[in-house]
């Protein structure tokens, strides 16, 4: 039997934040997250451990993820911790004339010519996804998210969790929509990221299921 602790409903939260790496002058995406990690650790890795906050790679080489090192009960304390790490990353990237860019999707990135799949650890998994789905689309390579991972210990707790958040889920995109432009053009959607995400796994829709909203 696993010794891994099983958390109860709302006992803790896991937080993940994704950022693009871009040129400071042109805002063009830069697939140099591996160089960022190498500059910090001395080696190309898939994770950088920094106490309460860790950095990790994503599917594409221009996106870096900041995440809680372990589930936390103290969400407010991570506001300053994440901000501190963003400043550290920007200081390191400045040596390459690069910086982090927030928002949900890059407004003028061309994913069909600028996508670079992560070529290092776990590349065989990413390459398989790329072979199946062609990950050059906006729904794969131009997609930055914030994840709040909420635990549940059993089916009853999952039912309560779903009941508690089902009214909030459709509201979140309306409050946080920040991707009205793709390919340098207004799309007609305030949350173009969500619209792209809706279609990115259409070849195997069972992998995603229904999207809310």
Give the location of each predicted region.
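Short hydrophobic/aromatic beta-strand micro-patches
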Residues: 22, 149-151
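Loop-rich catalytic cores of soluble enzymes, especially ATP-dependent carboxylate-amine ligases
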Residues: 107-112, 118-132, 140-142, 151-213
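Short aromatic/hydrophobic contact patches that present stacked aromatics
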Residues: 65, 147-149
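Terminal catalytic/cofactor-binding subdomain
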Residues: 1-136, 142
